[in-house]
C-alpha cells in the first residue's frame, strides 16, 4: 500500500508519459486498495467460505457493488476520475468492514492491532526509504525503470529488516521453516 504510493511519482512519468502526471494522485488515492482488497479476499476465502458463510459473503459483494455504483453516480460528475477512485476505495472498505463483522467470531479487532502494528511501522519506514531513494536517484540518474526497480528493492529490504529488528513473530516463524528445510532438519 505505502510502497505503491512511494513509487507513484517516479513511476508514472516513465511508464505512461508526462501527459499522465495527474494519474499520480489517483495512485495515491487507490493505494489503500492493496491492503483493503487483500484483507477482504483473505477473510472471504480463508474464514467465511470454510465457515459456511459463502452465501452471506456473496451478498456482501453485491452490497459493495451497489455502494460503488451509487458513489460513482454521485462523485464522478463532480470529481471525474478522482470520484471513481474514491468510490472504489470506499466500496472496498465497506466490503472489508462487513467481512470483518461477519467473521467477528474468528477475527477480533484487537488481533488486527496486535499483529498489524509492526507491519504498519515497517511500512511507514519503508515509505520513507522508497521516497528518499527515488529523490536521490532522480537527481543522480533521472527517472526511469531502473530508479523504480531500485526503489522497490530498497523498500523490500527495509521492510524485511525493520520486521527482523522488531522480532516479528510471523517473519521469524517462516525464517525458521526455511532454515530447517535448507539444513534438512525436521
What positions do the PLM features span?
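Short membrane-interface helical motifs at transmembrane helix boundaries
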Residues: 1-18
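Short runs within selected transmembrane alpha-helices of multi-pass transporters and secretion channels
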Residues: 2, 6, 25-52, 56-76, ...
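Transmembrane helix-loop junction
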Residues: 13-14, 50, 77, 104-105, ...
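Membrane-proximal transmembrane or re-entrant/amphipathic helices at the cytosolic face
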Residues: 131-186
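Alpha-helical transmembrane segments of polytopic integral membrane proteins
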Residues: 4-9, 45, 72, 100-103, ...
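Hydrophobic alpha-helical transmembrane segments in multi-pass integral membrane proteins
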Residues: 69-73, 124-139
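Residue-level signature of transmembrane alpha-helical entry/exit and packing/kink sites
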Residues: 22-26, 111, 115, 119, ...
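Small-residue-rich segments of transmembrane alpha-helices in multi-pass membrane proteins
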Residues: 61-69, 118-128, 184
